[in-house]
Swiss-Prot record:
Enzyme Commission number(s): 2.8.1.8
Record's subcellular location: Mitochondrion
Primary location recorded for the protein, binned into one broad class: mitochondrion
Region listing for Disordered, in residue ranges: 22-43
Pfam families: LIAS_N, Radical_SAM
Protein name: Lipoyl synthase, mitochondrial
Residue interval of the organelle targeting sequence: 1-18
Residues binding [4Fe-4S] cluster 1: C120, C125, C131, S366
Composition bias type Low complexity, residue spans: 22-39
Catalytic activity, reaction form: [[Fe-S] cluster scaffold protein carrying a second [4Fe-4S](2+) cluster] + N(6)-octanoyl-L-lysyl-[protein] + 2 oxidized [2Fe-2S]-[ferredoxin] + 2 S-adenosyl-L-methionine + 4 H(+) = [[Fe-S] cluster scaffold protein] + N(6)-[(R)-dihydrolipoyl]-L-lysyl-[protein] + 4 Fe(3+) + 2 hydrogen sulfide + 2 5'-deoxyadenosine + 2 L-methionine + 2 reduced [2Fe-2S]-[ferredoxin]
NCBIfam families for this protein: lipA, PRK05481.1, PRK12928.1
Length: 388
């Protein structure tokens, strides 16, 4: 019988390792009887495990007789190739330049000095250079993450740190944040928070206080708040909606069928819809907004159903972006959606009556948020003037 290359490699490596194991075992017999140190104990354990693996595998007779075909013997080089293929190559349309520019470095410096956290940095947003580094500061957008940089939840797509008991909120944070915003002269700012299920109010009053102080120090700055679901406590949604913000955002993240696999178990698709619905009911003039990631294995029908659910509660703005795996510990990318498909969903959103839709591989929930807001407010005013 003629052996294959894989089988020959297996036999050669097996023979060498067994010979080495026997010599090592013989050499260590005397010292072992006198009380083996930890290092020798570990070596003996490895030898035993190796012998067990050999006993479970095919014998020389199995190879000669042809019975070895029933055993799975993987070439180590082939296994390495298979592992590499699991990680899809990043398409060219997802590659971005290194962040730079005077405004970018100034924002970065101020954030560090005032001990603020930004989701732009914590979530490794690919658009940080574009949002922070523009020449016109009035069109720049910064997303400040309040209540610390540690979340009490563990969604499978998110790179933000997690802990059941994060540090207590910084009472000076609302004032520091407002000071930073007024110093930067930004036209639009997004406030977001980690989920703080450890706090009785989920951090709603802390976030609302920050909005109020920003409006006092920088009244011309438009404020968007991207909140959590407050564990379904709609009274906390009321607190946020009445704080004076301009846009109330809460992300669905994905379609209903994938929600249990993508988001933390304490989050829920219907629970998130209720947050957006309540915000609009509390302050009808508020622009409500959500974001959905693509590339997680969702179908077109599921996306359309999600959009229909959002329009049913009068959600105004939706954004679509490509899911990008932050680290190997996070869920894998199922598909890199092509730019043309994102254009399709943008057209579909307008067709369904959304006030605005930002859709593209690198789009995130706060991507060019100021530009989107201004454009849509102007469009809405034009429509109102025509009716008059």
């Amino acid at each position: 019988m003629r052996l294959t290359t894989v089988q020959r490699r297996f036999l050669v490596s097996t023979k060498a390792k067994v010979s080495g194991a026997s010599i090592s075992s013989t050499a260590n017999t005397g010292s072992a009887s006198a009380g083996a140190p930890n290092g020798q104990t570990r070596r003996r354990r490895r030898i035993t495990e190796f012998k067990d693996a050999l006993n479970l595998g095919p014998s020389f007779e199995d190879f000669v007789s042809g019975r070895a075909a029933g055993f799975t013997v993987v070439d180590p080089l082939e296994q390495m190739r298979q592992d590499r293929e699991e990680y899809k190559k990043l398409p060219k349309w997802l590659k971005v330049p290194i962040p730079k520019g005077v405004n970018y470095h100034k924002l970065k410096k101020d954030v560090k000095e005032l001990k603020l956290s930004t989701v732009c940095e914590e979530a490794r947003c690919p658009n940080i250079g574009e949002c922070w580094g523009g020449k016109d500061k009035s069109k720049a957008t910064a997303t400040i993450m309040l209540l610390g940089d540690t979340c009490t939840r563990g969604c499978r797509f998110c790179s933000v740190k997690t802990n059941r008991n994060p540090a207590k909120p910084d009472p000076t944070e609302p004032e520091n944040t407002a000071e930073a915003i007024s110093r930067w002269g930004l036209g639009y700012v997004v406030l977001t928070t980690v989920d703080r299920d450890d706090l009785p109010d989920g951090g709603a009053h802390h976030l609302a206080e920050t909005v109020i102080k920003i409006k006092q120090k920088a009244p011309k700055t438009l404020v968007e708040a991207l909140t959590g679901d407050f564990l379904g406590n709609l009274e906390m949604v009321d607190v946020m909606a009445k704080s004076g913000l301009d846009v109330y955002a809460h992300n669905l993240e994905t379609v209903e069928a994938l929600t249990p696999h993508v988001r933390d178990r304490r989050a829920g698709y219907r629970q998130s819809l209720n947050v957006l619905k309540r915000a609009k009911e509390t302050v009808p003039s508020l622009i409500t907004k959500t974001s959905v990631m693509l590339g997680l294995g969702e179908t077109d029908d599921q996306i359309i159903q999600t959009m229909q659910d959002l329009r049913a509660i009068n959600c105004d703005v939706i954004t679509f972006g490509q899911y990008m795996r932050p680290t190997k510990r996070h869920m894998k990318v199922v598909e890199y959606v092509r730019p043309e498909k994102f254009d399709y969903w943008k057209d579909k959103a307008k067709e369904m009556g959304f006030l605005y839709c930002a859709s593209g591989p690198l789009v995130r929930s706060s991507y060019k948020a100021g530009e989107a807001f201004i454009e849509n407010v102007l469009n809405k005013r034009k429509q109102d003037n025509k009716r008059i």
